[in-house]
Amino acid sequence: MLQHAPTLTRLVGELKKLPGIGERTALRLAFHLLKSPQNLGSLAEALTQVQERVCACSVCFALTEQNPCPICSGGRDSSVICVVETSQDMLALERSNAYHGSYHVLQGAISPLHGVNPDDLRIRELLMRIEQGKVEEVVIATNFTVEGETTALYLARQLKPLGIRVTRLAHGIPLGSDIEFVDPATVQWAMKGRSEL
């Protein structure tokens, strides 16, 4: 591609490793960065700082710069643990301002097709947290995908014998949507999960 510029070729190759970035977008980004050297320097500095400063919280395994993270060390309700797949999921829940307990980030979901087994996730650490503390409820907030559902079922089987309340995030028809436009699987889940008024 760029035989005369192996460094640029390497940059394009590294950018292509990012999710959603193909050859053309990587090339466009590389040339954009080269047009403004101050942006290139800022990006390089930010990447270096992230590599040096961001780590997994030793309690909940969320990405943080402070260990334990501000949520784990900030006096949140530790009797309820919300289990999520990723730090991004945790941030989405935090943005909603609907939950004020603690978290546990599994760092993935069970996916035999991709070689991810329960031992590859932070499930053992979750069980240890429950055994050590005064946990009354675990909210399973894994994604509503095949992998997320598999993980939720596995967690429920592991947690129920411990005598704590195990709940799952509700799922169904999104607020503000018309039923006629909702897919059949979502309508089925909504019917199964209906509640009394």
Swiss-Prot record:
GO terms for molecular function: DNA binding; zinc ion binding. It comes from the Bacteria. Residues 79-174 form the Toprim domain. A zinc finger (C4-type) spans 57-72. Keywords: DNA damage, DNA recombination, DNA repair, Metal-binding, Zinc, Zinc-finger. One of its GO terms (biological process) is DNA repair. SMART domains: TOPRIM. PANTHER family: RECOMBINATION PROTEIN RECR. Belongs to the RecR family. May play a role in DNA repair. It seems to be involved in an RecBC-independent recombinational process of DNA repair. It may act with RecF and RecO. This is Recombination protein RecR. The gene is recR.
